[in-house]
């Protein structure tokens, strides 16, 4: 397979790409825009939403913005969107749809990253649980209040199915995680608007999913080096990183550690992107899909790492879990964040009047499950800083996350 010619000039859309001219439309019908495709409108609505702005103050790994240069959900999302567009361009897909799915994929994340999600899921275990992907769907179909004619953003079918299924089907023989029940909010919405949960999502959504992996694999290394939790020497334990570092050290023997780290990160992104493009080309040549429907009916994803790169990526992930995500200083802050989220849930569930007017109005008429879901919606929308301030206001004993 060849990378020749990619990125230089116009290349005709592939027949298996998502075509905005044949979009399945929106849950609430709207007149089409004369100047933008449906997927471009989706991207624009996502960017202008409140949920998108909140990503600025939600963390990836490092809690409470321990430095101005660490990544937040917003910077991560922008990086994922850039990689997703690059992959879509290389494979002659619809770049706007790939970008839209990438931009919306993290909307449902709680404050304090996966720590906040785990804490909220624990409190919601008797009320249907909490899942950030399902929460993303709730935000774009219900919780955003911007438009006169509908709740949410009324995104196109293609963007919604990409959001819900970008990591693979949720039901059926090809379900990515058959042992995990589908979150109830997804099932509830799917009963109104069938997202075909047993079939694979578009190639554009698959680009967004693998772009997420590429981005955080590389950029968590960057942040870990910046924080001093990782060293270039420790990264020599990872075969992929060592191979790239050897190239950098040979070419630039006197390069300072900061630039060496950046050279590693950029080369890792490049090698992973090129691997995905070449592997996708191989899978497409083998499957020979002629239409978008053929993509949906495949027995596996057509965009992904090669077996060799997937094996190397697993080694890298194990290294990051051991040396970064479970580093003592990170774990201490995660325990504090866990306590903040659970304290806030308990307080607001017991006394809904503690929530702002827009959230507490009508709570007296809700049963326990509905009240728990409203409290979860409120907490999930918090930024890290707002959660800390609210905890301090209510308890005056907030753990120090700085």
UniProtKB/Swiss-Prot annotation:
Q: Pfam family of this protein, just one?
A: HD
Q: Can you tell me where the transmembrane regions are?
A: none
Is Lyase tagged as a keyword? no
Organism's domain of life?
A: Bacteria
Where is the HD domain positioned along the sequence?
Answer: 73-217
Q: Which InterPro entries does UniProt cross-reference here?
A: dGTPase, dGTPase-like, dNTPase_2, HD/PDEase_dom, HD_domain, HDIG_dom, PHydrolase_assoc_dom
Q: Where is this region: Disordered?
A: 20-39
Query: What family name appears in the similarity comment?
Result: Belongs to the dGTPase family. Type 2 subfamily.
* Listed name of the protein: Deoxyguanosinetriphosphate triphosphohydrolase-like protein
Q: In which organism is this protein found?
A: Brucella canis (strain ATCC 23365 / NCTC 10854 / RM-666)
């Amino acid at each position: 397979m060849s990378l020749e010619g990619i990125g230089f000039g116009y290349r005709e859309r592939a027949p298996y790409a998502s075509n905005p001219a044949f979009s399945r439309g929106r849950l609430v019908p709207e007149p089409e825009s004369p100047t933008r495709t449906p997927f471009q409108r989706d991207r624009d609505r996502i960017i202008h939403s409140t949920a998108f702005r909140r990503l600025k103050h939600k963390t990836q790994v490092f809690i409470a913005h321990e430095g101005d240069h660490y990544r937040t959900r917003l910077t991560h999302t922008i990086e994922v969107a850039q990689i997703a567009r690059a992959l879509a361009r290389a494979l002659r897909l619809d770049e706007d749809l790939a970008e839209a799915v990438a931009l919306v994929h993290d909307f449902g994340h709680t404050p304090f990253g996966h720590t906040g999600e785990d804490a909220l899921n624990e409190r919601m275990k008797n009320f249907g649980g909490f899942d950030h992907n399902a929460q993303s769907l709730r935000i774009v179909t219900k919780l955003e209040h911007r438009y006169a004619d509908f709740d949410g953003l009324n995104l196109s079918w293609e963007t919604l199915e990409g959001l819900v299924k970008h990591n693979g089907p949720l039901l059926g023989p090809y379900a990515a995680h058959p042992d995990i029940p589908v979150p109830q909010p997804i099932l509830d919405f799917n009963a109104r608007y069938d997202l075909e949960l047993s079939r694979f999502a578009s190639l554009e959504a698959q680009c967004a999913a693998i772009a997420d992996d590429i981005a955080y694999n590389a950029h968590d290394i960057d942040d870990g080096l910046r924080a001093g939790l990782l060293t270039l020497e420790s990264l020599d334990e990872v075969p992929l990183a060592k191979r790239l570092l050897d190239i950098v050290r040979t070419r630039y023997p006197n390069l300072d550690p900061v630039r060496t780290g950046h050279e590693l990160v950029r080369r890792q992104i490049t090698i992973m992107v090129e691997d995905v493009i070449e592997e996708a080309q191989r899978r497409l040549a083998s499957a020979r899909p002629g239409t978008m429907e053929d993509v949906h009916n495949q027995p596996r994803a057509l965009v992904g790492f090669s077996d060799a790169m997937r094996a190397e990526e697993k080694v890298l992930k194990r290294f990051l879990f051991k040396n970064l995500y479970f580093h003592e200083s990170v774990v201490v802050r995660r325990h504090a964040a866990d306590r903040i989220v659970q304290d806030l849930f308990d307080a607001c569930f017991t006394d809904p009047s503690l929530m702002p007017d827009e959230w507490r109005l009508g709570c007296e008429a809700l049963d326990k499950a509905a009240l728990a879901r409203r409290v979860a919606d409120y907490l999930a929308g918090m930024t890290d800083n707002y959660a800390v301030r609210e905890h301090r206001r209510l308890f005056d004993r907030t753990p120090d996350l700085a």
